[in-house]
Amino acid sequence: MAKYEIMLMVSGQLNQNQAQAVNDELKAVFGKTEITEEYLGQKTLEYPIKKEVTAHYFNLFLTSDGKSVHEYKRLASIRTDVLRILILNTEKEFGYRASQNAKKVALAKQKQARYNDIMKQVQENGYFQIKGSKRNSRVEKAGAKEVWMLREKFGEDLPEQKIPVLRKVNLTRKPTPNKSSENKQKVEKQA
């Protein structure tokens, strides 16, 4: 016995009572099994299926054996007024298996609590700050070019930072070696 979720799409040319009758005929395969059913309404399809543009959607949730589900699928595929059928074994899905694992549930609760703390801090302060760190991580790991840009922006007194004083250097231009001095050295070596 396994838990299944079945999505059934019945032709939109039928009215709601006829579509419900088709669904009831197919559900008879499961016998006295407890089935939770949701009628999701008649919706327009994104693309035509079997030359139909609308369909009635039904969701079924049940616990059954594989043989009954296979028979349900066989009967649904025979009927011409059933457009599509999707059967999911929810016990094989990772979300269901994770919800049954105590360690994963505890970890998820811990992560959710941390997320709630962060969102609360963002709503109160307008920003999130890691506990124990007053500096911006970009400034903390800043290279020479970034430090120079901060000095231009804030002046010599950077807020709450201890950055060594840099001499004014053009950081955008890379120094190129002087070719004439290299040629002189080669000539001297050859002579």
From Swiss-Prot:
One Pfam family hit: Ribosomal_S6
GO cellular component: ribonucleoprotein complex; ribosome
Residue ranges, annotated region (Disordered): 168-191
Basic and acidic residues composition-biased segments: 181-191
CDD domains recorded: bS6 (cd00473)
Signal sequence bounds: none
Gene3D superfamilies: 3.30.70.60
Biological-process GO terms, alphabetical: translation
SUPFAM superfamilies: Ribosomal protein S6
The keyword Lyase appears for this protein: no
InterPro entries in alphabetical order: Ribosomal_bS6, Ribosomal_bS6_sf, Ribosomal_S6_plastid/chlpt, Transl_elong_EF1B/ribsomal_bS6
GO molecular function (one): structural constituent of ribosome
Keyword terms, alphabetized: Ribonucleoprotein, Ribosomal protein, RNA-binding, rRNA-binding
HAMAP family the UniProt entry points to: Ribosomal_bS6 (MF_00360)
Similarity comment: Belongs to the bacterial ribosomal protein bS6 family.
Entries under NCBIfam families matching the protein: S6
Function: Binds together with bS18 to 16S ribosomal RNA.
Name of the featured protein: Small ribosomal subunit protein bS6
